[in-house]
Each structure stands twice: as structure tokens, then as C-alpha cells.
UniProtKB/Swiss-Prot annotation:
InterPro entries: PsdUridine_synth_cat_dom_sf, PsdUridine_synth_TruA, PsdUridine_synth_TruA_a/b_dom, PsdUridine_synth_TruA_C, TruA/RsuA/RluB/E/F_N. The lineage of its organism: Bacteria, Pseudomonadati, Pseudomonadota, Gammaproteobacteria, Enterobacterales. It is an enzyme of class 5 (isomerase). It comes from Buchnera aphidicola subsp. Schizaphis graminum (strain Sg). It catalyses: uridine(38/39/40) in tRNA = pseudouridine(38/39/40) in tRNA. Its EC number is 5.4.99.12. Homodimer. The active site is at D57. This is tRNA pseudouridine synthase A.
Length: 263
């Protein structure tokens, strides 16, 4: 009897992280990874293990998570998507699937990752946006925040924005894009880098929120130059953070699924 050949697949996943203990599987806890692996295993009729582009913390959301897995089972793309989604809660959804070459790796093949942080900026908190954004009651100076944030562009030692417990060997990262805009009561911060340190985005946002009309010029640059976590702002809530998009080389021809507005 001919042995079935393993095939590798990439999968695009969207999820609301409010109800899970982060991405990574943990014994006795409900996580995004464990839920997806259980659903995939049922459809594949064998144990499936997945690798993701970026492990998100408890409370962090995603519309752009990419994972890969291997399977000996044959299913159409439609059958994979509908089948897996039927075993997932409504807080997790598979958006696309594509067979990929053996050399594809969801984590190591990624060129860059983009995160979005959403702040509900109003004197009164929102019940609707409670788990989708971070509430800041003082009015934020978005123009000044944007100006200060530009000092983070390029390759730097981001030790000032690196939380304890970070397992990365190097504090150097390269931010290629950082944009901040206001949409009525929402302040939207988009950051793209080759990769991120532990809590790096949330610590950057925590520092930007400290900026006000009286903040002296080069506030963020001075924090960056200190290379000391004690000088940066607090780590902001996970509920405002989204893994927005993961970029891969064109040769893999992965679908691009990127919503501009994700509340």
C-alpha cells in the first residue's frame, strides 16, 4: 500500500483574545493554539501541531495571524475552512488556507509583522469597546505623539521597551513604519518591524501616552537612548492590541487578508 505523503499548509486566523490565556498551549488552560490544534486534528483525523507567526499574550487579538501545519489528509480548501470553523468557538475563525512548499515556516519565513494598538480616547469609558481597546480619559495630542514616535524608526537597541522575561538574545529590532492617527474617539497606532521584543509594542504605547502639550522635544528618543526599561512608560493593557498583518516573500503567494478597521 502506497504511503500517504505529508503536505504542508498555511492558514490565516482571526481571533478575539479576550477569552483565552494567550496563544501558546498551556496545560489545563484554554488557549488559541490548543483550540486550533484540536479542531484541525478532528478534520485531519490525526494529531496536528501548528507553528504560528507570532505568539500573542492573553487578551491580545488578531486578524492577521498565520500558522502552518502538516497533514496526510486530503481535503479541499473549502472543506478545511468550513470543517475547522465548525469545531471552533465564534471567537476564533479560519479565514483562508493554502498548500505551501516544504521550506515555508510561519515564523521564520516572515519578513515583517504589523501590530495595531487602539485607544478609546474619551473622558467616559465605552461599554461597547471595552475588550477591543484601551481607555484613556485625558485628551491625547496625536500630532505630538506621531512626531516623537518617528525617532523609533530604523534599527535600534530597544532595551528601554523590553519587559523582563524576554527570551530574545538581542535587543536590536528594526521598525520600518510607525503611524498614529485619530478617528473620532479612537487613536490608532500602527507599528511594523522585522520582529518584536516581549511587550515591546505595549511599552512603546505606554510611553507615547505619557506625552502631553508640555512634554519636551525628543522625549521618546531620550528614553530609547537610555536602554533601560525603568525610563519608559507602563505596559498598557493587552485588550487594545491586534496582530494586524504578517508579510512574507512573494514566492509563497499567500492570500492577503487585511481589514483596515478592526473594532
Amino acid at each position: 500500500m502506497k504511503e500517504k505523503k505529508n503536505k504542508k499548509f498555511a492558514l490565516g486566523v482571526e481571533y478575539d483574545g479576550s477569552y483565552y490565556h494567550g496563544w501558546q498551549s498551556q496545560k489545563g488552560l484554554s488557549t488559541i493554539q490548543s483550540e486550533i490544534e484540536k479542531a484541525l486534528s478532528k478534520i485531519a483525523n490525526h494529531q496536528v501541531n501548528v507553528i504560528c507567526a507570532g505568539r500573542t499574550d492573553s487578551g491580545v487579538h488578531s486578524i492577521g495571524q498565520v500558522i502552518h501545519f502538516t497533514s496526510i489528509s486530503f481535503r479541499s480548501d473549502f472543506s478545511w475552512i468550513v470543517g475547522v470553523n465548525s469545531y471552533l468557538s465564534k471567537n476564533i475563525s479560519v479565514k483562508w488556507i493554502k498548500e505551501v512548499s516544504e521550506n515555508f515556516n510561519a515564523r521564520y519565513s516572515a519578513i515583517s509583522r504589523s501590530y495595531r494598538y487602539i485607544i478609546y480616547n474619551h473622558k467616559c469609558r465605552s461599554a461597547i469597546f471595552r475588550n477591543r481597546s484601551n481607555h484613556v480619559y485625558k485628551e491625547l495630542n496625536v500630532d505630538k505623539m506621531y512626531f516623537e514616535a518617528q525617532s523609533l524608526l530604523g534599527e535600534h537597541d530597544f532595551s528601554s521597551f523590553r519587559s523582563s522575561g524576554c527570551q530574545s538574545r538581542s535587543p536590536f529590532r528594526t521598525i520600518t513604519d510607525l503611524n498614529i492617527r485619530r478617528l473620532k474617539n479612537l487613536v490608532i497606532i500602527d507599528i511594523t518591524a522585522n520582529s518584536f521584543l516581549y511587550h515591546m509594542v505595549r511599552n512603546i504605547v505606554g510611553s507615547l501616552i505619557q506625552i502631553n502639550d508640555n512634554t519636551k522635544k525628543n522625549y521618546i528618543k531620550k528614553i530609547l537612548d537610555k536602554k533601560d526599561r525603568n525610563y519608559a512608560g507602563p505596559t498598557v493593557s493587552a485588550r487594545g492590541l491586534y496582530l494586524f498583518f504578517v508579510k512574507y516573500p512573494m514566492c509563497f503567494n499567500l492570500p492577503i487578508f487585511k481589514d483596515d478597521f478592526i473594532i
